[in-house]
Swiss-Prot record:
GO molecular function, one term: DNA binding
Biased composition (Acidic residues): 195-215
Protein name: Floricaula protein
Tissue-wise expression: Bract, sepal, petal, and carpel primordia, but not in stamen primordia.
Location(s) in or outside the cell: Nucleus
Biological function: Required for flower development. FLO may interact in a sequential manner with other homeotic genes affecting floral organ identity.
Composition bias type Basic residues, residue spans: 178-190
Major localisation: nucleus
GO CC list: nucleus
GO terms of biological process kind: cell differentiation; flower development; regulation of DNA-templated transcription
Family membership noted in the UniProt record: Belongs to the FLO/LFY family.
UniProt keyword list: Activator, Developmental protein, Differentiation, DNA-binding, Flowering, Nucleus, Transcription, Transcription regulation
């Protein structure tokens, strides 16, 4: 018997797979139904509303209904709170959609948060674009307020205001006691001075008084400016007086920007240059604008605004005599008191009536000088009626 007869030989060329009748009879299973898209899907259909509302508990279909009405993120950001209320009322009336109470507040909160984020990005972008040129341009004015020792007391009081008598000499004499008190408690005051920028008493009119009183309790710093004639460009490391007055114009521009942002956010709008404006200027890259410097020379700027001819004449006279900025600053008080005398001694009304001065607080020292001169004038008038001699200026 041939054993090969019982062997099965597989021919790969002719063999075909046997059809599976069982699988043919059974229909293929239907594909699984598509899952409902999550909240983070379909970003193009809602125009970015889902990203705006996602963190504020607003339902997806609420955002979809808002998108069906034609609203986008940019549209909502440019709408006021009253317009947002009208939009939500229209949503309820047109689609018969019941908005939850939390959704009404969530929509407004999301819009406000997005506005703040855009404003912060804009300030940061502006700081990156303008930071290099700004710091290079104004580094010289900033170095004047560094922690440097005083040259002499005459730098602070400016040679007694150029020989002016009466109250002006008393003010200069009262300032001679300041250096001893500064050296006594310098360490404690330096910490307080560093916290001054973060103080939030923006709307208190006593800021002007606090600034003048702090002259006694702060370490005296070197003046960052030199006396220059109108139109003269300063030479050396210090800037001229035209540049100083230009800083006040910049503060006015920053105040307008702060007011615009506050109105858009529905927040309290400042009417004067406060700490909020100085912080905004710092964020915008204008580190050379700070509260101590601007409050220190605000009466000089007031004279420049109220009587530019007298201010220019005073600058030329002090430039010819070689006087420093401290002497020029002290001499600026007397013309302002004379202006106040011609207008009933009401220096606050004079400031508030001027468009460029109404945003600044009246320095306490200027107000005190006006009060003292007013009292002296009243005493002199009384003495002339009774036949007495001339009255002396009253100290204060």
């Amino acid at each position: 018997m041939d054993p090969d007869a019982f062997l099965f030989k597989w021919d790969h060329r002719t063999a075909l797979p046997q059809p599976n009748r069982l699988l043919d009879a059974v229909a293929p299973p239907p594909p699984p139904p598509p899952q409902a898209p999550s909240y983070s899907m379909r970003p193009r259909e809602l125009g970015g509303l889902e990203e705006l509302f996602q963190a504020y508990g607003i339902r997806y279909y609420t955002a979809a209904k808002i998108a069906e009405l034609g609203f986008t993120v940019n549209t909502l950001l440019d709408m006021r709170d009253e317009e947002l209320d009208e939009m939500m009322n229209s949503l309820c009336q047109i689609f018969r959609w019941d908005l939850l109470v939390g959704e009404r507040y969530g929509i407004k909160a999301a819009v406000r948060a997005e506005r703040r984020r855009i404003d912060e990005e804009e300030v940061r972008r502006r700081h990156l674009l303008l930071g290099d040129t700004t710091h290079a341009l104004d580094a010289l004015s900033q170095e004047g307020l560094s922690e440097e020792p005083v040259q002499q007391e005459k730098e602070a009081m400016g040679s007694g205001g150029g020989g002016v008598g009466g109250v002006w000499e008393m003010m200069g004499a009262g300032g001679r006691k300041a250096p001893q008190r500064r050296r006594k408690n310098y360490k404690g005051r330096s910490r307080m001075a560093s916290m001054e920028e973060d103080d939030d008493d923006d709307d208190d009119e006593t800021e002007g008084a606090e600034d003048d009183e702090n002259i006694v309790s702060e370490r005296q710093r070197e003046h960052p400016f030199i006396v220059t004639e109108p139109g003269e460009v300063a030479r050396g490391k210090k800037n001229g007086l035209d540049y100083l007055f230009h800083l006040y114009e910049q503060c006015r521009d920053f105040l307008i920007q702060v007011q615009t942002i506050a109105k858009e956010r529905g927040e309290k709008c400042p009417t004067k240059v406060t700490n909020q404006v100085f912080r905004y200027a710092k964020k915008a890259g204008a580190n050379y604008i700070n509260k101590p410097k601007m409050r220190h020379y605000v009466h000089c700027y007031a004279l420049h605004c109220l009587d530019e001819a007298a201010s220019n004449a005073l600058r030329r006279a002090f430039k010819e005599r070689g006087e420093n900025v401290g002497a020029w600053r002290q001499a600026c008080y007397k013309p302002l008191v004379a202006i106040a005398a011609r207008q009933g001694w009401d220096i606050d009304t004079i400031f508030n009536a001027h468009p460029r001065l109404s945003i600044w607080y009246v320095p306490t020292k200027l107000r005190q000088l006006c009060h003292a001169e007013r009292s002296s004038a009243a005493v002199a008038a009384t003495s002339s009626i009774t036949g007495g001699g001339p009255a002396d200026h009253l100290p204060f």
